């Protein structure tokens, strides 16, 4: 059994060498390639014959029985190259035995009487009696037009697959086109809604009572009120009555007029002269909010203890209302306001000096609106 396996392995290796030579046929010399191919092919045939003889011999209880040759309805002439049929004549006798070796992509046919080798679309004829082996190589391939006649089922399957792919592509294109159309309609609807909303806002503003009509050098706002009296107001304060219209004419004022205008301009939300309504109480007020300028002065005084709450006393009473940590300093900053008199705007904040922790930095803001009260007790 081991002998049969070794002989079979050697025969398969010889067949692989023949296939490698055929694969590298274009890279080698023509004369040397023919000699190597003939010798390797002969060796492969001999080894396969040796395998057949070992299997046919009766060794032990195992016997090798040749199967009857199945008659195929397809003639072998259809599987061969048409050019090969014209050049090579295949003997048809019942006494000839043709063992066939098939690989994954090629068909190898070995015939004993004539020692001929047919491999795919290439045919080789070997003659051992001649002085030099003869090699007939036919490299002509079957034209693509003959393939559909041999495989009609595969052709139909390919056509069906192509039709399915085309239908899928058409469906995808239609879906994409519908999606783009819906997206464009949505954008158009949003734009229309936005324009409608803006038109409503403009209409509300116009119905509020002010409409501006611009000319080259004058701006004429008109009041849409039936009970409004007819007057005309200029920059210098003079009032003139005009029949039929209520208009305010603004010319280009000089620098002195601008200063007087800014000084006399009042907020309409302030109310009466006594200030019953504060200017900043309404969100519709457009008065300029000026930040109060606070005078600050800082002094350094020695600390009276290591506690943060202990601050050196002065002429006023102070109440602590906040504390905040300082970035980069382990000591916080304390905030105090004057408690000597109610409503005093004076403030101060105390922090420990980073260079000298025994000193305190006291910063005063604003001024006291009351005299000093030395008799009061100082509280922190």
From Swiss-Prot:
Residues within the DNA-binding region(s): 307-373
InterPro entries: WRKY_dom, WRKY_dom_sf, WRKY_plant, Zn-cluster-dom
Compositional bias (Polar residues): 84-98, 139-148
Entry's Gene Ontology BP terms: glucosinolate metabolic process
Domain of life: Eukaryota
Keywords from the UniProt entry: DNA-binding, Nucleus, Transcription, Transcription regulation
Chain segments carrying region Disordered: 84-107, 139-196
GO CC term, one of those recorded: nucleus
Principal place of residence: nucleus
Intracellular or extracellular location(s): Nucleus
Gene induction: By salicylic acid.
Pfam families: Plant_zn_clust, WRKY
One GO molecular-function entry: calmodulin binding
Composition bias type Low complexity, residue spans: 154-178
Function per UniProt: Transcription factor. Interacts specifically with the W box (5'-(T)TGAC[CT]-3'), a frequently occurring elicitor-responsive cis-acting element.
PANTHER family linked to this entry: WRKY TRANSCRIPTION FACTOR 21-RELATED
Family designation: Belongs to the WRKY group II-d family.
Name of the protein: Probable WRKY transcription factor 21
Naturally occurring in which organism (per UniProt): Arabidopsis thaliana
Gene: WRKY21
């Amino acid at each position: 059994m081991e002998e049969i396996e070794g002989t079979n392995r050697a025969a398969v290796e010889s067949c692989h060498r023949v296939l490698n030579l055929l694969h590298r046929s274009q890279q080698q010399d023509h004369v040397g390639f023919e000699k190597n191919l003939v010798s390797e092919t002969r060796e492969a045939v001999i080894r396969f014959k040796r395998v057949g003889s070992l299997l046919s011999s009766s060794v032990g209880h195992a016997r090798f029985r040749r199967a009857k040759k199945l008659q195929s309805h397809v003639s072998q002439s259809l599987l061969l190259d048409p050019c090969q049929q014209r050049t090579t004549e295949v003997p048809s006798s019942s006494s000839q035995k043709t063992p066939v070796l098939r690989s994954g992509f090629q068909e190898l046919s070995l015939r004993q009487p004539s020692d001929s080798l047919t491999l795919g679309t290439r045919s080789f004829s070997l003659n051992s009696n001649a002085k030099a082996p003869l090699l007939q190589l036919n490299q002509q391939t079957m034209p693509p037009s003959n393939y559909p006649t041999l495989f009609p089922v595969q052709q139909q399957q390919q056509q069906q697959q192509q039709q399915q792919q085309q239908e899928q592509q058409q469906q995808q294109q239609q879906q994409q086109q519908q999606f783009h159309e819906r997206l464009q309609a949505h954008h158009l609807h949003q734009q229309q809604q936005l324009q409608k909303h803006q038109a409503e806002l403009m209409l509300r503003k116009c119905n509020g009572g002010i409409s501006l009509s611009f000319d080259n050098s004058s701006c004429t706002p008109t009041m849409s009120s039936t009970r409004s009296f007819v007057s005309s107001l200029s920059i210098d304060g003079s009032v003139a009555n005009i029949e039929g219209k209520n208009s305010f004419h603004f010319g280009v004022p000089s620098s002195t007029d601008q200063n007087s205008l800014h000084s006399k301009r009042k907020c309409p939300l302030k109310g009466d002269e006594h200030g019953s309504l504060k200017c900043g109480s309404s969100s519709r007020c457009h008065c300029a909010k000026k930040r109060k300028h606070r005078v600050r002065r800082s002094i350094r005084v020695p600390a009276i203890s290591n506690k943060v709450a202990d601050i050196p006393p002065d002429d006023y009473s102070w109440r602590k209302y906040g504390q905040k940590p300082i970035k980069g300093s382990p000591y916080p900053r304390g905030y105090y306001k004057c408690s000597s008199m109610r409503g005093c705007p004076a403030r101060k904040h105390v922090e420990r000096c980073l260079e000298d922790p025994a000193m305190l930095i006291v910063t005063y803001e604003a001024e006291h609106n009351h005299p000093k009260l030395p008799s009061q007790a100082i509280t922190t």
